[in-house]
Amino acid sequence: MARQEQANDVFALTSFLYGGNADYIEELYAKYEDDPNSVDPQWRDFFAKLGDNADDVKKNAEGASWTRKNWPIAANGELISALDGNWAEVEKHVTDKLKGKAAKGEAKGATGAALTSEEITQAARDSVRAIMMIRAYRMRGHLHANLDPLGLSEKPNDYNELEPENYGFTPADYNRKIFIDNVLGLEYATVPEMLDILKRTYCGTIGVEFMHISDPAEKAWIQERIEGPDKKVAFTPEGKKAILSKLIEAEGFEQFIDVKYKGTKRFGLDGGESLIPALEQIVKRGGAMGVKEIIFGMAHRGRLNVLSQVMGKPHRAIFHEFKGGSYAPDDVEGSGDVKYHLGASSDREFDGNKVHLSLTANPSHLEIVNPVVMGKARAKQDLLAGRTRDDMVPLATRAKVLPLLLHGDAAFAGQGVVAECLGLSGLKGHRVAGTLHFIINNQIGFTTNPAFSRSSPYPSDVAKMIEAPIFHVNGDDPEAVVFAAKVATEFRMTFHKPVVIDMFCYRRFGHNEGDEPSFTQPLMYKAIRAHKTTVQLYSDKLIAEGLIKQEEIDQMKAQWRENLETEFDAGQSYKPNKADWLDGAWAGLRTADNADEQRRGKTAVPMKTLKEIGKKLVEVPKDFHVHRTIQRFLDNRAKMMETGEGIDWATAESLAFGSLVAEGSPIRLSGQDVERGTFSQRHTVLYDQETQNRYIPLNNIQKGQAIYEAINSMLSEEAVLGYEYGYSLSDPRALVLWEAQFGDFANGAQVVFDQFISSGERKWLRMSGLVCLLPHGYEGQGPEHSSARLERWLQMCAEDNMQVANVTTPANYFHILRRQMKRDFRKPLIMMTPKSLLRHKRAVSTLNELSGESSFHRLLWDDAQYNKDEGIKLQKDAKIRRVVLCSGKVYYDLYEEREKRGIDDVYLLRVEQLYPFPAKALINELSRFRHAEMVWCQEEPKNMGAWSFIDPYLEWVLAHIDAKHQRVRYAGRPAAASPATGLMSKHLAQLAAFLEDALGN
């Protein structure tokens, strides 16, 4: 018992050291170090006994160099009240103000005399209650807004939370003026005056969610923009007519296509026509606030309407596509895509402000275009800042390019890539100064009701995690929709942060025009059939206002239809005049042809230049404290540069990067942990061990060089890869690389590989030079750390769509990276990259192999053929009994095993580039060994790796050279369900077995 009491005493004496007080104690300690007399004597004694270094104490108090400044935000009265209902601060603030007013004679009681202290207390209580009621409307008003055009959604149980009675006001108080300190733009207001503003602002056809935002400036801006007696949604007569005109265009276009192409899929905008005037407003207001370019990404719903009414794509071109015509000239090859996937670009001008618009081509996989659009926007923003920029481009510069994403309600709530993109929005390497998200919320996903497609009240709720403001709006009130679009655009341009518009509307017909929605939504479609269109409702409103007559509206509709008829006739003979895919940033590039040797590019770098770059790679500023292991790494690299020997993988990569930035090609390397490299091999970003400041040797190669950026990405594959692909679409003169942490994880982004990287050029005439670095190799690390699934990339290869390589030397890696920039066309490159080879004594190159006339080799010879100091000397070609062909790391396993066994009549030939397949080069090499047995050896199981892909090619080559053995024999792991074993003993047994199969008698 005594021991228990003793422990309690110790606890009582030291409880102030509880972790939650740490920040406070550190600040106090720093204060003590500055001036011991500035703290309480007890604290003085406590700190004196610690005897810490004064500088360390101050550093601790300041916190880490990477911490966010002014964060967390100091809790204000309103924030406290939100969390714990403590309104005392607010009451004190109001009481002080009222006392001040009473002293100046500005506040009087009911009799006209100065306020007594009781009256001040009562007035302060009234003020606090009124502010509590106002706050309730800000927090919960959106739940009571009139958002559903069909009126089908159930009203939430509000528990009287918005009723004045809930805050202590009875009808007897309604005529009393209450001090509200300009909270609603009024200093004093009666309860009915407050309710009038609050209901109009928060419970009309717009519902705003913004109280989840922690930045007081952003919250105050929204309040100031929408609250107040003069903040009604108001448009001039011209503005209203312009809205009506765009609605008539949107509705008329859909109806016209419905008549002309009955039953053809168009994924119409019927029921959501307010989108079109809203987009016009975004373009117009954005242009006035400095936007130079808007990049759209959207799904199929309403796409043709956006293309024609917003992007200005000629209607005749769309009608030409409806009758089965191609969107590209006849001389452009490509497999094409359906109408509602195609992109477009145009220039629009409002009030003298030119804005370039582009709509990104996309697949049917919903929301996957989002990161692509963001990546494109980032690249355009970087181009505005210039190739020699540093890595901190001002957000005001970035804001000139606006990514605008249109979503469906079910997809926004359902697709994980949406949350991934929101996660990217604030990151230094991926931010785009705010994306504008517009949800076309037709309250259904194909045939699924919202109750079954999301667990939250709104589809937009996922956006709350990044504190984006959300404007819910009724699509049958076009003025409210346009107003919401205007405020959202202004918020983005002011704060450079994402913002969401959630437009409640409906889908007048089925998911597509051949669909019958009443099977699954009978009540909804009964209501829709009885519901007037948005054009009818808005026309009725303007007629009632006396702004326009029915005859004028009929005339507007007739003129629009006449215009569409003219375009329809022109569409019958329409011919696309040129493909736009090599315009702008792509000017000077061409389509690749199949001629073999022209594809190498001049990739060698003069020896002198390599040495100069190498010197810069190992230099750090004098006062920079390098980690001792990193210093060793730099010293080793300096030695390599001095001798020109032993160039390892990471050094070859840095030399390739250094030479490219020196030549003016920016480099963007992104992925998980790429600064250091998963295997601690890269270290292109160095950290000072004292200050944590960064130093990047590759950005200090020479004056006027292009930028090198290594971006440690968030832990996502899908959104990050989509983003980097988008970046590569906008800037063909930047080398863009994405590295998977292990190649095994690349399939987390499979949609991007399937829908964009492998097929984008054939479907949409869009080239990309993106490089994917996928660590691959069997080293006994188990099924998720061994295989980048080489077979999958090869299965996608056809029509010269991309390159797949599995190189074995640093020199070849150097050349293949430079080759991406040194040709006048662009192709994606899928690279199997090494793990154990990063430090393998044989996997090294010389500087000579990077300079002079050297270049990339698609096939590499047996090292024993040319290196005289190797352990074995090969027989002459005629005496070689077997040729073992292989690709990647397994070459070194075979080489060492052959040396161990003293075999001199087996030749090892490496296929470094698997696609495009080097057939001619292979014919030349294998002609030397016509009588030898041919073996394909791989470390992957038989149903994986390159075997299934390469077997028919090799058979064709053997037939072509009239080889003695017309079939290639397989040596490798047997077929397996899992890519690799997790047991080291089993891994080694499998390795020994297939090496015996490949090299044994």
UniProtKB/Swiss-Prot annotation:
Q: What highest taxon heads this organism's lineage?
A: Bacteria
Which positions make up the signal peptide?
none
For this UniProt record, the keywords arranged alphabetically read as follows: Glycolysis, Oxidoreductase, Thiamine pyrophosphate
Task: Give the InterPro entries listed for this entry.
Answer: 2-oxogl_dehyd_N (IPR032106), 2oxoglutarate_DH_E1 (IPR011603), 2oxoglutarate_DH_E1_bac (IPR023784), DH_E1 (IPR001017), KGD_C_sf (IPR042179), ODO-1/KGD_C (IPR031717), THDP-binding (IPR029061), Transketolase-like_Pyr-bd (IPR005475)
EC top class, as a word: oxidoreductase
Q: Does the keyword Oxidoreductase apply?
A: yes
Cofactor(s) for this UniProt protein: thiamine diphosphate
Q: Which Pfam families match?
A: 2-oxogl_dehyd_N, E1_dh, OxoGdeHyase_C, Transket_pyr
- Report the catalytic activity: N(6)-[(R)-lipoyl]-L-lysyl-[protein] + 2-oxoglutarate + H(+) = N(6)-[(R)-S(8)-succinyldihydrolipoyl]-L-lysyl-[protein] + CO2
Q: Name one GO biological process term.
A: glycolytic process
A molecular function annotated in GO for this UniProt entry is: thiamine pyrophosphate binding
One GO cellular-component annotation of the UniProt record comes to: cytosol
Instruction: State which Enzyme Commission number(s) the record gives.
Output: 1.2.4.2
> What this chain does, per the record?
E1 component of the 2-oxoglutarate dehydrogenase (OGDH) complex which catalyzes the decarboxylation of 2-oxoglutarate, the first step in the conversion of 2-oxoglutarate to succinyl-CoA and CO(2).
The family classification in the record reads: Belongs to the alpha-ketoglutarate dehydrogenase family.
Quaternary state and interactors: Homodimer. Part of the 2-oxoglutarate dehydrogenase (OGDH) complex composed of E1 (2-oxoglutarate dehydrogenase), E2 (dihydrolipoamide succinyltransferase) and E3 (dihydrolipoamide dehydrogenase); the complex contains multiple copies of the three enzymatic components (E1, E2 and E3).
Q: Which NCBIfam families match?
A: 2oxo_dh_E1, PRK09404.1, PRK12270.1
What is this protein's name?
2-oxoglutarate dehydrogenase E1 component
Record organism: Brucella anthropi (strain ATCC 49188 / DSM 6882 / CCUG 24695 / JCM 21032 / LMG 3331 / NBRC 15819 / NCTC 12168 / Alc 37)
Gene name in the database record: sucA
